[in-house]
Design a protein with these regions (language model features):
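Hydrophobic alpha-helical transmembrane segments in integral membrane proteins
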Residues: 137-163, 183-188
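Non-catalytic terminal accessory segments
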Residues: 1-150, 410
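Soluble catalytic domains of enzymes that build or remodel membrane lipids, polysaccharides, and related
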Residues: 164-412
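Short extracytoplasmic/periplasmic juxtamembrane "stem" segments immediately C-terminal to an N-terminal membrane anchor
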Residues: 81, 85, 156-170
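Short, functionally important structural connectors and interaction interfaces within domains
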Residues: 75-78, 144-146, 151, 160, ...
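Short amphipathic alpha-helical coupling elements at transmembrane boundaries
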Residues: 112, 159, 192-195
């Protein structure tokens, strides 16, 4: 699909979504406040609608005038606080509300034969319920956005391993991903996150890439902040998507500058490579594969890198997971598979029995732990944001993986 068609499709979707929501909210207001002036209500809603749509109109106008597919936003606080944030907050409120309202409408259609004699009463009740739901989400969505901006969850995962080497018993691996230093994830937010990482007292720290979002501006900040992490056996990272995008037209330079900045703080960013070391008498191998939109290792080079024998514990660190890579790691007897990229479903909507996120269209491995026989795969929720400048129902995460011998753990 061409860029122009994507723009037109996005505009059409926004129009239809807002049209449905506006119709619902006008009916709901009249149900709750029957004496409300209809013209004033509609006028206020039109003004609010026009205001929140300044952002997409700006993007369309900027694209039309520049003919570029990538539009750089003004780097001013007021533009983000008064234009960008209101648009995305309102869009999330609208979509979250519509998901529930569509379900209610569907139930009304299905149950219509049973209540058609009381149609007017049911319709009035439905409109009042609509008002209550929208009012709730107007409060909940911004509140949750604020919470997910400031909060960091520490998740501890006990990994019970068959025949674990005694010297690896209790090894604490702190795993993070998608830090994405930028104008939104600034020094203060990074400080809070690194403080949480250090509070886990890690033996080993592994990162699934994406230390910045874009532009070289934040390379040194990202390296400096990660350099504050205390780790007994060091800090290691694979290459992520955004690590390629400091210079959009020169991805190799982007990765090189990020790698060099990290090296100043004794942090290794490994691009399709491996690192071996001993913990006591235990031999540990870590393999780092660049599995991103820009670069994917496949075929014989991938097999050569993954193939290894004679190690007591093997870890694979990648940015993006994927079924073929998972099966490869499993076939080469890796114990632990670590990935990020998804932000845990950065925007996740509330819905009965399931969580709905756009990330579901890309991968089934959105967050949490997955077992493939004896291999454990962990998908970390990360810290940063992409496209939408905040998180919704996806609290940033530091994952702590503690190794235990399965027999000893079972005996307890």
């Amino acid at each position: 699909m061409s860029f122009v068609l994507r723009i037109l499709l996005a505009v059409l979707i926004i129009f239809l979504v807002e049209f449905y929501f506006i119709k619902k909210i006008i009916n709901a207001i009249h149900a709750f406040f029957p004496k409300a002036d209809s013209k004033k209500v509609k006028r206020i809603i039109r003004i609010i609608t026009a205001y929140i749509n300044i952002y997409p109109l700006y993007l369309i106008l900027a694209w039309f005038l520049s003919s570029q597919t990538r539009i750089d936003l003004p780097d001013t606080i007021w533009f983000h606080y008064f234009i960008v944030y209101p648009f995305w907050t309102c869009i999330l409120i609208i979509i979250q509300s519509i998901l529930i309202l569509l379900l209610i409408d569907l139930l009304r259609i299905i149950l219509f034969p049973f209540y058609k004699k009381h149609r007017e009463k049911i319709n009035l009740f439905s409109r009042k319920l609509t008002f209550i739901l929208i009012a709730f989400f107007i409060l909940y969505v911004p509140g949750r956005i604020i919470y997910d901006y400031f909060a960091v969850s520490i998740r501890i995962k006990e990994f019970n391993v068959h025949n674990l080497h005694p010297d690896l018993q209790g090894l604490k691996i702190t795993f993070i991903s998608d830090i994405q230093a930028d104008k939104y994830t600034d020094r203060k937010r990074l400080d809070n996150f690194i403080e949480k990482v250090n509070s886990t007292n890690p033996d080993l720290v592994l990162i699934a890439g994406d230390l910045i979002t874009s532009t070289p501006t934040y390379i040194n900040l990202a390296a400096e902040m990660v350099g504050k992490i205390n780790s007994k056996y060091g800090i290691y990272s694979c290459v992520g998507d955004h690590d390629h995008w400091s210079y959009r037209q020169d991805t190799k330079r982007s990765v090189r500058e990020m790698t060099e900045a990290l090296a100043k703080y004794n942090i290794k960013m490994i691009d399709n490579g491996k690192f071996d070391f001993k913990i006591g008498n235990a031999d540990l191998r870590m393999t780092f594969i660049t599995n991103t939109y820009v670069n994917r290792l496949t075929g014989q080079p991938l097999d050569t890198l993954l193939n290894s024998n004679g190690y007591d514990f093997k870890i694979l660190v990648v940015h993006q997971s994927g079924d073929s890579l998972i099966q490869k790691a499993k076939s080469y007897n890796y114990n632990l598979f670590l990935a990020g990229h998804t932000h845990g479903g950065q925007v996740t909507f509330i819905f009965p029995y399931i969580k709905i996120s756009p990330t579901m269209f890309e991968t089934q491995y959105m967050r949490g732990d997955f077992y493939f026989d004896d291999m454990l795969m962990v998908i970390n929720r990360g810290l940063g944001m992409s496209l939408v400048p905040f998180r919704y129902n996806s609290t940033p995460e530091v994952t702590v993986i503690v190794l235990n011998d399965k027999k000893q753990f079972s005996a307890k």
